[in-house]
């Protein structure tokens, strides 16, 4: 009986160590976009804004990272493994597109690809010549300093029956699972938005007047609601960007082995 209980405890501790992880370490390969025009046509629908995020250090990711658009805006630290050409720090990239290839987990912008190189003359150009490289990568929080998350009202929006928004500068290390929407007031009647594609959310039940949002994210293993009051004024306009008044800082736990622990150094 004692041995049986000991076995249960060992299994529990092992399972906990595997499942509870802030940052999972992944090993795969990465390529880069040879055409700069591809960076502005990513599946996340950031358009030409994509190249302005993280100084153009952006990437396309496989479906398990893209998550039908929920992974748009996620940040990853990635480094290549060639000891002659690659730095140990690597670079941080933001996900802006879907990578449908089964040869690589990530396809980086050429700027991000070169940033993985050692800071020695010619290393970045030699790295580009490799085309596809072995990498390690881990998810990290997106840090925008003191900047709040923004809400962009897309051009397809039309009062009073259709609202299409895109989330920009989304911080933290988690995903927005759902968005609720309501008119600003003492007793709001909350509706919901649907993810259309990428970072774009839509609703055909548009509240009148000023609009507030509730963003549901994962903090640890649990859901958490972030309430953003009075984001869109009553005279909101398509094509404009509005300050959400809040920022996401939560970290979602991942289930994996190994965690980054002391491996990334």
UniProtKB/Swiss-Prot annotation:
Topology relative to the membrane, per the entry?
Single-pass type I membrane protein
Matching entries from SUPFAM superfamilies are given as: Barwin-like endoglucanases (SSF50685), PHL pollen allergen (SSF49590)
Q: What family does the Swiss-Prot or TrEMBL record give for this protein?
A: Belongs to the expansin family. Expansin-like A subfamily.
Q: What is its main location?
A: membrane
**Residues bearing carbohydrate:** 99, 102
Kindly state which keywords UniProt assigns to this record, in alphabetical order. Glycoprotein, Membrane, Signal, Transmembrane, Transmembrane helix
Q: Which GO terms describe its biological process?
A: anatomical structure morphogenesis; plant-type cell wall loosening
Pfam families the record matches: DPBB_1 (PF03330), Expansin_C (PF01357)
The cellular component terms of Gene Ontology attached to this UniProt record, alphabetical and capped at eight, are: extracellular region; Golgi apparatus; membrane; plant-type cell wall; plasmodesma; secretory vesicle
Domain Expansin-like EG45: where?
41-147
Upper lineage: Eukaryota, Viridiplantae, Streptophyta, Embryophyta, Tracheophyta
Signal peptide positions (record): 1-20
The residues covered by the Expansin-like CBD domain are: 161-244
The answer to whether UniProt assigns keyword Signal to this entry is yes
Name the domain of life this protein comes from: Eukaryota
The portions of this protein that span the membrane are: 42-62
Q: List the source organism.
A: Arabidopsis thaliana (Mouse-ear cress)
List localization entries: Membrane
Name of the protein this chain belongs to: Expansin-like A1
Name of the coding gene: EXLA1
């Amino acid at each position: 009986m004692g041995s049986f209980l000991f076995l249960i405890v060992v299994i529990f501790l092992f399972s906990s160590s595997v499942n509870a992880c802030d940052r999972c370490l992944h090993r795969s390969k990465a390529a880069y976009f040879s055409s700069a025009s591809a960076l502005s046509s990513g599946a996340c629908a950031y358009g030409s804004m994509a190249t302005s995020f993280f100084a153009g250090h952006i990437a396309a990711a496989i479906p398990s990272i893209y998550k039908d658009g929920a992974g748009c805006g996620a940040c990853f630290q990635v480094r290549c493994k060639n000891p002659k050409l690659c730095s140990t720090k690597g670079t941080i990239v933001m996900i802006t597109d879907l990578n449908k290839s089964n040869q690589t987990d990530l396809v980086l912008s050429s700027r991000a690809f070169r940033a993985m190189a050692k800071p020695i003359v010619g290393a970045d150009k030699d790295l580009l010549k490799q085309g596809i490289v072995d990498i390690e990568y881990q998810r990290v929080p997106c840090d925008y300093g003191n900047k709040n998350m923004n809400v962009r009202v897309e051009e397809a929006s039309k009062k009073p029956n259709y609202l299409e928004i895109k989330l920009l500068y989304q911080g933290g290390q988690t995903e927005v699972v759902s968005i609720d929407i309501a008119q600003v007031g003492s007793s709001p009647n909350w509706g919901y938005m649907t993810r259309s594609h990428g970072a774009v959310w839509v609703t055909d039940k548009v509240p009148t007047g000023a609009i507030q949002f509730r963003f549901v994210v994962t903090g640890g293993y649990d859901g958490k609601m972030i309430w953003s009051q009075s984001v869109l004024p009553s005279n909101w306009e398509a094509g404009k960007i509005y300050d959400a008044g809040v920022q996401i800082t939560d970290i979602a736990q991942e289930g994996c082995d190994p965690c980054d622990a002391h491996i990334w150094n």
